């Protein structure tokens, strides 16, 4: 039996990452083998590319190609083998993030994105994507309060992040059966109740 592939998405400051390990723990309590990973990253090569992607200035197409190169390695080394063994993968960001950040935020031609997506992972898509959405001003306030060094995406202007958010919502509108939008501007307890309900209904 093929495993399940769940991804977490959302603008910077949406708080999605704090729920990734929680969901993995919940699934492990049910006896499911779960791999927690992230993009860019997830493999030794992917983590090296992550450092470049998050910190080095580069041409849009270079950035996009490196994202997909890291993803191909990630799929080949971790995601596809785990799913083939019947294990689950919970990933912090995947291809929807490239659609939102490079496509929406940076203005990459959508046709180029779709061609790369098809080439790199064919028909493989997450079984479920949890999109954490909240007003941009709330997200920016959370980032400021975190008081940490920001990567190059987090340092982008407000209009960039608004385009990213709208691209995410557009993607969710076109794939409503896969992408479930979570109101991230509510209590952690309520968010986790909603996550458990969605995963139980859609994947278990």
Swiss-Prot record:
UniProt KW Transferase keyword: yes
Keywords assigned: ATP-binding, Kinase, Nucleotide biosynthesis, Nucleotide-binding, Transferase
Source organism superkingdom: Bacteria
Residue intervals passing through the bilayer: none
SUPFAM superfamilies given in the database record: P-loop containing nucleoside triphosphate hydrolases
Gene Ontology biological process terms in this record: dTDP biosynthetic process; dTTP biosynthetic process; dUDP biosynthetic process
Cellular component terms (Gene Ontology): cytosol
Pfam families: Thymidylate_kin
InterPro entries noted in UniProt: P-loop_NTPase (IPR027417), Thymidylate_kin-like_dom (IPR039430), Thymidylate_kinase (IPR018094)
Binding residues annotated for ATP, in chain numbering: 10-17
Function: Phosphorylation of dTMP to form dTDP in both de novo and salvage pathways of dTTP synthesis.
Protein's recorded name: Thymidylate kinase
Gene giving rise to this polypeptide: tmk
């Amino acid at each position: 039996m093929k495993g399940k592939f769940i991804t977490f998405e959302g603008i910077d400051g949406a708080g999605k990452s704090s729920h990734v390990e929680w969901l993995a723990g919940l699934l492990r309590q049910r006896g499911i083998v779960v791999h927690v990973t992230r993009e860019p990253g997830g493999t030794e090569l992917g983590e090296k590319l992550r450092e470049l992607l998050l910190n080095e200035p580069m041409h849009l197409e270079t950035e996009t190609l490196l994202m997909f190169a890291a993803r191909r390695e990630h799929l080949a080394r971790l995601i596809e083998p785990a799913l083939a063994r019947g294990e689950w993968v919970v990933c912090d960001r995947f291809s929807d993030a490239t659609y939102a950040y490079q496509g929406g935020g940076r203005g990459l031609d959508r046709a180029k994105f779709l061609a790369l997506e098809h080439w790199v992972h064919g028909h493989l898509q997450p079984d479920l994507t949890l999109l954490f959405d909240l007003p941009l001003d709330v997200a920016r306030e959370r980032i400021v309060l975190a008081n940490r060094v920001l990567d190059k995406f987090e340092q982008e202007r407000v209009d960039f992040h608004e385009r990213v958010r709208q691209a995410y919502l557009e993607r969710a509108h076109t794939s409503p059966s896969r992408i479930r939008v979570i109101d991230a501007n509510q209590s952690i307890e309520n968010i986790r109740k909603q996550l458990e309900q969605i995963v139980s209904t859609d994947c278990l």
